[in-house]
């Protein structure tokens, strides 16, 4: 771990960790997105899976996601202690020792990969292993601290769950799986750059080279609208694929109109206005981005649910 002066207080060292503290290491909010998108990938696949196998497989994907979260918190404990947004996480708050997080993450990683291989197939397990490695090592240990493109490249880690879900069902990769991957991959930069606009001081203090730190807020705003335009083209275009359909397309048109408007509003903002209203527009866009992704994958899920009745898809 890089050292930026992280230490736990004597009182914190006497604290006995509770079950909830260990669960918090797994990043349950992130895990919920992983579970949902993996489930959509599983359900959208053209091959049906026995419910028990499907449930168990998604459970092991969730455990793998939690494992990578624990490894990330172990490695990032020093900068988490500096940032207001993360200072109350279990390790910097002294509720869990770093070694415990490392052991938990390593154990759950091995368990999830092995069990997914036995439950589903080796390709799905291999993709899960790569995802954990990418997030814990490539992103957390390298990209996050060394390049302003950290969340652009690192976004791949969060984009793999629907691909894994698809592979659980089919045992192979296809263009539809990669379209779902691309949706999350292209969504990640504007989502996190919006956060970085109103949390810039946190990244400054921690020495994390987010785009707002290295290039300033003005260029970050321009990057947000550029990626949002590309994302909108991709999202609407997905409506004409095998996982799309009229329901998805209608949802995508509305969602991307709203998202583009939000990005334009951010792009037009001057810094004095943003400071005066405490980044109200940026915070609104950040919240919208969460609903944006859930709604797109919800529409894909609805299309797959309607398809057996002859109502979904084209």
Curated annotation (Swiss-Prot):
Main location per the UniProt record: membrane
Disulfide bonds: none
GO cellular component, one term: plasma membrane
One Pfam family it belongs to: UbiA
An MF annotation (GO) of this entry: protoheme IX farnesyltransferase activity
Keywords attached to this entry: Cell inner membrane, Cell membrane, Heme biosynthesis, Membrane, Transferase, Transmembrane, Transmembrane helix
UniProt EC number: 2.5.1.141
Pathway assigned to this chain's UniProt record: Porphyrin-containing compound metabolism; heme O biosynthesis; heme O from protoheme: step 1/1
Catalysed conversion reaction: heme b + (2E,6E)-farnesyl diphosphate + H2O = Fe(II)-heme o + diphosphate
Topology versus the membrane: Multi-pass membrane protein
One biological process term in Gene Ontology: heme O biosynthetic process
Membrane-traversing stretches: 30-50, 51-71, 122-142, 151-171, 178-198, 224-244, 247-267, 285-305
Compartment list: Cell inner membrane
Known role: Converts heme B (protoheme IX) to heme O by substitution of the vinyl group on carbon 2 of heme B porphyrin ring with a hydroxyethyl farnesyl side group.
PANTHER family cross-referenced by the UniProt entry: 4-HYDROXYBENZOATE SOLANESYLTRANSFERASE, PROTOHEME IX FARNESYLTRANSFERASE, MITOCHONDRIAL
Assigned protein family: Belongs to the UbiA prenyltransferase family. Protoheme IX farnesyltransferase subfamily.
The protein's assembly and partners: Interacts with CtaA.
Miscellaneous remark of the record: Carbon 2 of the heme B porphyrin ring is defined according to the Fischer nomenclature.
Name the UniProt record assigns to this protein: Protoheme IX farnesyltransferase
The organism of origin for this protein: Roseobacter denitrificans (strain ATCC 33942 / OCh 114) (Erythrobacter sp. (strain OCh 114))
